[in-house]
């Protein structure tokens, strides 16, 4: 988990990047439709969290790089890399190039990641970590 005491305004990530801003606003709206989240801004990225961060964005010129944290390996057409972190934490990397990339399948995975961020997700038959 990264940490910085420097206060960076959210808008600073989008200077000269109107397409990336539109994509981020669509991504944020889709997540906020599932419930309240906290937006934490650092110099290099934007983290989206409930009790813990579960997704976020690195702003590129005209797209977003993102990850989502799940307790299982999942598949989606946008995933560019999937990493196992520890015993049962999976980090799924993806990019959003168009609003249509935020499809129903991705939204379902983001709902699941939100449960991980809520620290409420325990896979069936497994004891809490």
Protein language model features and the residues they cover:
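Charge-dense, helix-prone N-terminal extensions
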Residues: 1-129
């Amino acid at each position: 988990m990264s940490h910085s005491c420097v206060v960076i305004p959210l808008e600073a990530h989008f200077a000269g990047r109107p397409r990336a801003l539109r994509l981020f606003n669509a991504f944020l709206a889709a997540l906020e439709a599932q419930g309240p989240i906290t937006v934490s801004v650092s110099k290099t990225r934007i983290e989206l969290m409930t009790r813990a961060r579960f997704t976020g964005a690195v702003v590129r010129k005209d797209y977003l790089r993102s990850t989502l944290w799940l307790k299982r390996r999942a598949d989606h057409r946008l995933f560019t890399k999937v990493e196992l972190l520890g015993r049962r934490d999976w980090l799924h990397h993806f990019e959003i190039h168009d609003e249509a990339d935020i499809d129903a399948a991705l939204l379902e995975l983001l709902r699941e990641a939100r449960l991980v961020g809520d620290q409420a997700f325990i896979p069936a038959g497994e004891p809490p970590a």
